[in-house]
Amino acid sequence: MRFCRGTVLGRSAAGMAVLLALGACYEEDDQTLPSAAPGESVAAESTHWLEIDDSRSPETFLSAESGLPAQTLAPLLGALSAHYRESPRMIANRVLQLWQEYPDTPLERIMADLVPARDAPEESLGPVAQQYRVLRAGGAGHADAVAAAMGQRE
């Protein structure tokens, strides 16, 4: 069969090619952090996520993944949840991912240090976590990365 430019069949084939190309570019907004640059290790690939249909509480999930007592994690998660827009489930996923990528910093310290000042406006943890990741990947230590990511530059 011959496809001619300008015919209905030719336009349909061109339209289908455009749709397929656009479909390949589509990424679902799943609230995950972007992947690492080529050559960088991607801990997120091995991260266990607390799925939306998981019956465990975020504290229980973090406890199972980190080995820390849920009673230690609950107040930290509560403080983070009081400030950030994400659900406790998503906050648990984000802090676990940061800890798995940078295990040199204890999970409870990451969580405690990400709790903003009481008078800070509510915001999203996603951009804060992403800036922290970028800074740590660039060689910054935990304290400097947290301070910069949370806008506490001096």
Curated annotation (Swiss-Prot):
Going by the entry's taxonomy, the superkingdom of the source organism is recorded as Bacteria
Per the record, the GO terms for biological process are:
methanol metabolic process
Keywords, sorted A to Z: Methanol utilization
Q: Which PROSITE patterns match?
A: PROKAR_LIPOPROTEIN
Q: In its UniProt entry, what is this protein called?
A: Protein MoxZ
Identify the coding gene: moxZ
